[in-house]
Amino acid sequence: QMRDRLAQVSDQEFQRSRVEILSGLMRLRQICDTPALFMEDYQGASGKLDSLRDLLVQVADGGHRVLIFSQFKGMLEKIEQELPDLGMTSFKITGSTPAKERQDMTKTFNQGERDAFLISLKAGGVGLNLTGADTVILVDLWWNPAVEAQAIGRAHRMGQEETVEVYRLVTRGTIEEKIQELQEQKKHLVSQVLDGTESRGSLTLAEIREILGISEAST
């Protein structure tokens, strides 16, 4: 439905509907995590959560400790609910977590307490030195190289002696694959979609069509 609309919309109409269209892009990204982030009454499965669950079983069986990043607070909450069933304990930091709590949780985690650390994008770049982990899982699209490196860097710090394994979760056949394909050829475009700066007016109609795979012939 969104593709059909954007295939026909003019630049003038796009400018009038920019907020609505960009909100639609955000919903598509949330649905890639789990439709439950967008549909409150959704009771179905999530391929990404299923894959994450399988990966976390391997992490736990291998005696590893993990940092799990997501841009969406709701996704972190879903993951947090899954961990007890896997026999895993966790800490969680979001943008609203007070600085003192962050410091206390970071210190305790690095001393060996708990198995996982859930971190939101907004909180991930602020003074976190989590050398207690040897595995990093990027749940959402993080193909802005600077942001991805920053997330991985939470575990790569002075004193980290173990190799850090990094996993990215990509939902097949979705907008995530399209953005992955565009990573090298349009890094600035990918960055705007992932860090939210598209709302500032820099993302054009043509670029959104490219993300959604709408060809010029269909416009």
Indicate residue ranges for each PLM-predicted region.
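SF2 helicase/translocase ATPase core recognition
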Residues: 89, 101, 105, 109, ...
